[in-house]
């Protein structure tokens, strides 16, 4: 651990930026909110693709909450909640720096899940992401917490990003809203030569078949990364909403972990 950044060597800086943990070939991470586990998607040049699980200790940084009416400022209620949610409090070193003393001076951890950490604050009357609390509580997403705590880095071991198997897709729709439109084309392409355009007529059966085919292709190709232009905000929600409207059983779609 670097005690003073001013005295850090080139090797220490490199280790800090690139992650000191030696594990290689992690290309993606998913967090299971039900299980509290991290799912590591790995693409090893020798062993091939695999999914491994790992755990971490959820944490956040917290400042002075004495004026926040946290659990009505009742110490007994706070301690009871700490027991319920497995909370551990660590005081951080601030030295003689006045700015640090006025900042986030506590590391809050839980022996339970990320949800328990969030619930600890919400049940005490504080929304960790609320406008009034952003300066007092900082909770990172589970994936970021895992990478920081375990000192790991994505894509370590790859000289070129093109070595990672990627798939991109795009939906063509008749409207911006799935409630009054339909999918009439799905384009799929990966960086290893696969290309497919699924054309769909105006019959519901054709759209249903195309959606199932899309997920079957993903399962067959098994790309390490799936992406698209604004896909998380448009294509994926659109796809699942159309499946719902068409009466499809989305549990039949082959995913990373059907139990999550």
Residues covered by each model-derived region:
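The two-metal-ion catalytic cores of nucleic-acid processing enzymes
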Residues: 1-260
